[in-house]
Regions:
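N-terminal secretory signal peptides
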Residues: 1-4
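C-terminal segment of N-terminal export signals and the immediately downstream linker at the start
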Residues: 24-56, 62, 72
Length: 375
């Protein structure tokens, strides 16, 4: 039976703040019959090749291990991904062990999303990227069955997507200049800091561009007074905000810095899951939400709503990822003040095609699910 979108959203409760409970719409009444078998989960390891050595405050790498997942039912396939940079504490081996232990075949209705995702989250502690890979695949699958992209299901306007920043990792001056040149289509640059050469990094970039900059210190500064001096200097250089300047455990120092700094201080490592959002309120001006840390789209959606309710701004961010996870995060981007969704732009072997960037702005495509295809 045909239904218009407003009735559909009302029926399924997808437009509510909680987000994903589907009380009346089930796979059985969409298709007329339950499938004979339940959800089929498959996965395979894949290594992302970075275009440049990627250096943060505490590490460098040329590859990022990921796990690519699929969820299938009755001819529909949803795609997911777990990206596991070393600092996340997961690996292809731990992801394989976690995913192998799941019994998703017990679920024959993919619209029982709350029940399915709660089962996955309770299966074992941690493993947030592995959990996100199934969450993303489940959302992609459900969206394909409904023949709608998730930004439409949530009621978001594609016109409200922010510009995405392009990340410049810590490097030698000539390489930094090359990266800035490669980032020509992007309106905002994110600069990784946290080394002894922070001022040189900024001066090098400012010698070749006057674009807006934001910086991510990745907990690289240790002293609050030194951090304040740096933030004051960064403001003079046209920086817009600073991510995680101090170790996340130093809450008192961060609160002092936020009170005295002339720029917004944004939580990155201090934010992983929904329970961390309230802890950040009153200490940070905003939070960076990453699917790989929060178990996926469902919890990220809840975190955005809670952050805004606590007067904090939101950045939707990423790891080094394929277009699969980037396109999943992009479905949420109309509700974010900032986006840092360039992880797929930093690799040379993306196996998917998905969300586009036009003139530095995220462009959502009208394709069902998370809007990707294999290439």
């Amino acid at each position: 039976m045909a239904t218009n979108r407003r009735d559909f959203l009302k029926k399924t409760a997808l437009a509510t703040a909680g987000g994903l409970v589907l009380p009346t719409l089930t796979y059985s009444n969409m298709k007329g019959v339950f499938p004979k078998q339940g959800l089929k989960l498959s996965f395979e390891p894949y290594d992302l090749q970075l275009k440049h050595v990627f250096t943060l405050a505490n590490s460098s790498r040329t590859t990022t291990p990921v796990m690519l997942t699929k969820l299938e039912i009755d001819g529909f396939t949803g795609y997911g991904e777990a990206s596991m940079p070393p600092y996340l504490g997961e690996s292809q081996e731990t992801a394989a062990n976690f995913l192998s232990a799941l019994n998703l075949g017990q679920f024959s209705d993919p619209f029982r999303m709350e029940e399915i995702l709660e089962y996955i989250d309770e299966a074992a502690p941690g493993n947030t990227a592995a959990k996100a890979s199934v969450d993303i695949a489940l959302h992609d699958l459900a969206g394909k069955i409904m023949n709608q992209p998730w930004y439409k299901i949530w009621g978001y306007s594609p016109e409200n997507t922010p510009h995405t920043s392009f990340t410049i990792g810590i490097d030698e001056p000539e390489v930094v200049k090359q990266k800035v040149e490669e980032a020509a289509p992007y309106k905002i640059l994110k600069v990784k800091l946290g080394s002894d050469n922070d001022k040189e990094m900024i001066e090098t970039i400012r010698s070749v561009t006057d674009k807006p900059l934001c910086v991510d210190v990745n907990q690289g500064w240790k002293d609050k007074k030194v951090a304040l001096e740096m933030v004051e200097w960064l403001k003079e250089k046209g920086i817009e905000f600073v991510e995680q300047p101090l170790p996340k455990e130093n809450r008192d120092d961060i609160a002092w810095l936020s009170e005295n700094a002339p720029l917004p201080i944004i939580a990155d490592e201090a934010i992983q899951r929904l329970c961390d959002v309230k802890k950040a309120a009153g200490i940070y001006s905003g939070i960076n939400i990453k699917l790989m840390k929060c178990t996926g789209m469902r919890e990220a959606h809840q975190m955005i709503n809670l952050a805004h309710a606590n007067q904090m701004r939101v950045m939707i961010g990423c790891m080094t990822e394929t277009s699969c996870a980037i396109s999943a995060a992009a479905q949420l981007s109309p509700q974010a003040e900032w986006a840092d969704l360039d992880g797929n732009l930093l690799i040379s072997n993306d196996p998917y095609e998905g969300v586009k960037v036009a003139d530095g702005k995220i462009t959502l495509i009208d394709q069902p699910g998370i809007g990707i295809r294999e290439i």
